[in-house]
């Protein structure tokens, strides 16, 4: 996949989520569709960070929340195209922990939240052998330009 197309509305939603959950990591899903080697965002679904300890540096999404996101996507003929999480007071680059727990095929959007304010975000894809992340291009598009069929 060479890029992810995001609407400003979705960017605003995941940025606000990162700010609301600060100083803990937030997490969530983006539902959308694929067209060729690009993905198109349609909806942001926030998820609860269920990690019991060290939530400032780690997140955990309950398996039932994953299933709910998949079910929601399936019901609308969409896909889970991205998993989003924040890095409180750290850069928007994947950590070794992120790499060790990621799966190929998803975009991973990381939001850098500094002192309670979302300051940047980047999207990453895990390479096929799971050794490193490749940064994806992000294109901001208008909602009305998305054709999911």
PLM segments and residue spans:
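Conserved beta-strand-loop surface patch within small alpha/beta domains used
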Residues: 1-80, 89-149
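Residue-level "edge-of-site" marker
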Residues: 86
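Conserved, mostly hydrophobic/aromatic
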Residues: 83
